Amino acid sequence: GKVYGRCELAAAMKRMGLDNYRGYSLGNWVCAAKFESNFNTGATNRNTDGSTDYGILQINSRWWCNDGRTPGSKNLCHIPCSALLSSDITASVNCAKKIVSDGDGMNAWVAWRKHCKGTDVNVWIRGCRL
């Protein structure tokens, strides 16, 4: 996987329309990526329920993508989970847009709830040319 620089990721996310998507400023997305994956597109983490989280935003195979090994997977983003590990974050961003529109907003991301929610997330884009 590719490890993004902070400002590099901010620029890519902005280009893909995440800034203020569903009311969440760009800093929220960069902060979430930092604490979910440390900006690494190749990150994978297995969960106790047998599902796996994939990519820079740690998108889960029980609901959002298909990895062929998660029983009862819904694959609501209609993608193979491997697509979420690409150095090109388009698939992750498109799926994240679907997730954040699902009703719970960015609360869907535990790391965002724990580390970003209610903080000054603008620090994550400070000094970036955007």
From Swiss-Prot:
Keyword Hydrolase applies: yes
Gene Ontology molecular-function annotations: lysozyme activity
Disulfide bonding pattern of the chain: 7-128, 31-116, 65-81, 77-95
Residues covered by the C-type lysozyme domain: 2-130
UniProt-listed InterPro entries: Glyco_hydro_22, Glyco_hydro_22_CS, Glyco_hydro_22_lys, Lysozyme-like_dom_sf
Biological process annotations from GO: defense response to Gram-negative bacterium; defense response to Gram-positive bacterium; killing of cells of another organism
Cellular component GO terms, alphabetical: extracellular region
Reactions mediated catalytically: Hydrolysis of (1->4)-beta-linkages between N-acetylmuramic acid and N-acetyl-D-glucosamine residues in a peptidoglycan and between N-acetyl-D-glucosamine residues in chitodextrins
Top-level class of the enzyme under EC nomenclature: hydrolase
Signal sequence extent: none
Keywords: Antimicrobial, Bacteriolytic enzyme, Disulfide bond, Glycosidase, Hydrolase, Secreted
Subcellular location: Secreted
Other known facts: Lysozyme C is capable of both hydrolysis and transglycosylation; it also shows a slight esterase activity. It acts rapidly on both peptide-substituted and unsubstituted peptidoglycan, and slowly on chitin oligosaccharides.
Subunit and partners: Monomer.
Protein task: Lysozymes have primarily a bacteriolytic function; those in tissues and body fluids are associated with the monocyte-macrophage system and enhance the activity of immunoagents.
Record protein name field: Lysozyme C
Organism encoding this protein: Phasianus versicolor
Originating gene: LYZ
